[in-house]
Amino acid sequence: IHHLQVARVTNLSRAIDWLKEQGIWVAGAAGESQTRWFEFDFTLPVTIVLGSEGSGLRANIRKKCDALLSLPMLGRVKSLNVGAAAAVFFYEVVRQRLLNSQKK
């Protein structure tokens, strides 16, 4: 629970297909999603897909995701930069898995 694997791939679409074949859920960061980041079960085997800061996830990648999750913002800021968004998502993964391990 104290280690998260990070991967950079050259073909994201094929990588997502492979991950799904391995039984791994794919959660994409999408600001307009109605599902907030903490509502997803990150105790599952999951990968988080983050888009570019300017345009987010491409349409074909969004369609491949099992869930689209948002980090709602207040005020004039529309979104976090990708590094800050990654930190929020990764912290939530660790938080849920830590809570889950304490229940056992």
Question: Where are the predicted features?
Answer:
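RNA substrate-binding interface of SAM-dependent RNA methyltransferases
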Residues: 1-35
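Active-site/ligand-binding-proximal alpha/beta "capping" segment
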Residues: 27-81
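Structured adenosyl-cofactor binding patch, chiefly the S-adenosyl-L-methionine
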Residues: 2, 59-104
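Surface-exposed beta-strand edges and their flanking turn/coil or helix-capping segments
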Residues: 21-22, 41, 52, 83-84, ...
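Short, basic, helix/turn surface patches
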Residues: 6-15, 55-63, 102
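Residue-level recognition of oxygen-bearing side chains
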Residues: 11, 45, 85
